[in-house]
A protein has these predicted regions:
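Soluble FAD-dependent oxygen oxidases
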Residues: 2, 11, 15-513
Length: 513
């Protein structure tokens, strides 16, 4: 149940006693701020003098408001009354303390790509992190400090220009921490593991407004939880993570478009390609989709697949020979510096996958292998929608992600909160529906559930696993955070210790109020 702002306070202060001459704390005053009367003017008057002069405070009447509150999906949007953009890391605990004293809910935002239904229960102040965007490479050249507002694009470009790379999400527009606190899959995981596997330490603002340094020797229990379930425990203002020499000057990409008649051949070749944990570590990422392309056919979806290889075309094409043997209706390939690979694979800031402001209906499941029979059922279901509702079909994208997973599986499962290291493939059903079109929203939900069940039925005997960063919020706790009872108990224990009032409950929460 959604609690009212008057009954939910994240302030965990000392007992109040009546002392002669003492002022009454704001949260006991008769006219405390509530959701109904929260304005940027009042927040500026009360908070402005306590934070740095580069901190921005504004509300819905400001021309910047719509831009900074826009999200990847308009499904289950949080209700934002006031924006506060801290100018310094030290402003964040001050903002949190202010919110606590006034019973105001707060939500930290970097990329705005969360799609969890739980976000729709939020009503309060957005702490926009975009001004916290500095990167500092350490003298050793083995790590760097990153501030909490960074998205993937500037991290890739800055490090590359300095001769380095690190693990990031696959899409340029996603927040580094939004991805990393849930694990963080990306093109370097075959070599180096997940984003979270490379985090060395974090500066975290807890729910009570205190700041802690979290690493292997300080709050090591919380470090475990931050690596896979970190959205539940605090606001990360900065973090140190591993960086690596950038390697080859160019990467090779090869994109294919196949017709549906090639489906079984494609997926059988993919299973051989990935083998049993034998995907070459430099064959960093391959991703495919069922989607409409009416320049090829208006009667059924096409199969699009993209491969990215860390190295030369000559090396890559040896591995891609089985796919070159499958008759395609379109192919393109090239060799580009790594920062241009997202554009080549359709995951850049300017590509549709990064566009904000649509209504998305989604579902997801982790897989170990591709099941060609299940994929045929999914493809034929898509084809039926093309005939039944071309508008719904036009906005659909059934996505498949394959990685080199050696670096992920090399990390012990019990060493972090990230639960699904033996799963190798990520999937996402994603349908864009028109705003305020209830009938199509319901049809898209039904389709999303159908595809999820078909994917999962293709791996008999396995429980359903869902990547928390792709989870829509309707999965079970076990499906998002792991099926082992000890793992969930450890997360609950950390929650009780570090966030007893469950302030951080708006992104696929461990504890549901």
């Amino acid at each position: 149940m959604k609690a009212s702002v008057l009954s939910v306070s994240c302030y965990f202060g000392a007992l109040w006693t009546l002392v002669a001459g003492a002022s009454i704390p704001r949260y006991f005053q008769k006219h405390a701020i509530t959701r109904r009367d929260l304005t940027s003017t009042q927040v500026q008057q009360e908070l402005g003098g306590l934070v740095s002069n580069t901190t921005l405070i504004f509300g819905p009447d400001d021309p910047r408001f719509n831009n900074v509150t826009s999200r990847w999906t308009d499904f289950s949007r949080p209700h934002i009354q006031v924006i506060i953009e801290p100018g310094l890391e030290s402003d964040v605990p001050t903002i949190v303390q202010y919110c606590n004293e006034n019973s105001i809910e707060f939500l930290a935002v970097s990329g705005g790509h969360g799609l969890a239904a739980s976000l729709g229960t939020f009503n309060g102040i957005q702490i926009g992190m975009r001004q916290l965007n500095n990167i500092s490479i350490q003298p050793s050249g083995k790590s760097a400090w990153f501030q909490g507002g960074l998205t993937v694009l500037p991290v890739i470009q800055y490090l590359w220009d300095k001769g380095f790379v690190t693990t990031t999400g696959g899409c340029e527009c996603v927040g580094m921490l939004g991805a990393g606190l849930g694990g963080g899959h990306g093109r370097f995981e075959g070599l180096y593991g997940l984003i979270s596997d490379n985090i060395l330490q974090l500066n975290v603002v807890l729910a009570n407004g205190s700041t802690v340094r979290v690493n292997a020797t300080s709050h090591s229990d919380l470090l475990w939880g931050m690596k896979g379930a970190g959205h539940n425990f605090g606001i990360v203002t900065s973090y140190e993570m591993n960086i690596f020499p950038r390697g080859p000057d160019t990467w090779h990409y090869h994109n294919y478009v196949w017709r549906g008649q090639q489906l079984e051949t494609v997926f059988n070749a993919l299973n051989v390609f990935h083998g049993n944990d034998t995907t070459p570590v430099n064959m960093a990422f391959n991703a495919g989709s069922f989607l409409m392309n009416t320049t090829i056919t208006s009667e059924e979806p096409i199969i699009f697949w993209s491969f990215a290889y860390r190295g030369t075309a000559e090396e890559a094409e040896k591995y891609l020979a089985p796919f070159n043997a499958i008759e395609a209706v379109y192919e393109e390939m090239g060799d580009v510096p790594y920062p241009q690979i997202p554009k080549a694979q359709g995951t850049s800031m300017s590509d549709p996958i990064c566009q904000h402001g649509n209504v998305h209906r989604t579902s997801t499941v982790f897989l170990r292998v591709w099941n060609a029979t299940a994929e045929r059922l999914i493809f034929e279901g898509f084809k039926q929608r093309v005939a039944q509702d071309p508008v719904l079909a036009a906005g659909a994208n059934i996505m498949h992600e394959g990685y080199s997973t050696e670096g992920v599986e090399a990390v012990a499962s019990a060493s972090s909160a990230y639960p699904f290291r033996s799963d190798r493939h990520l999937t996402l059903f994603n349908a864009i529906v028109p705003h305020n079109d209830t009938a199509r929203e319901q049809a898209a939900w039904a389709w999303a559930a159908e595809v999820r069940d078909q994917w999962n039925a293709g791996q008999p005997g396995r429980l359903l696993d869902a990547y928390v960063n792709y989870a829509n919020g309707f999965e079970t706790l076990e499906q998002r955070y792991g099926h082992e009872s000890w793992r969930l108990e450890r997360l609950r224990s950390l929650k009780a210790q570090y966030d007893p009032d469950n302030c951080f409950r708006y992104y696929n929460p461990i504890i549901v109020n």
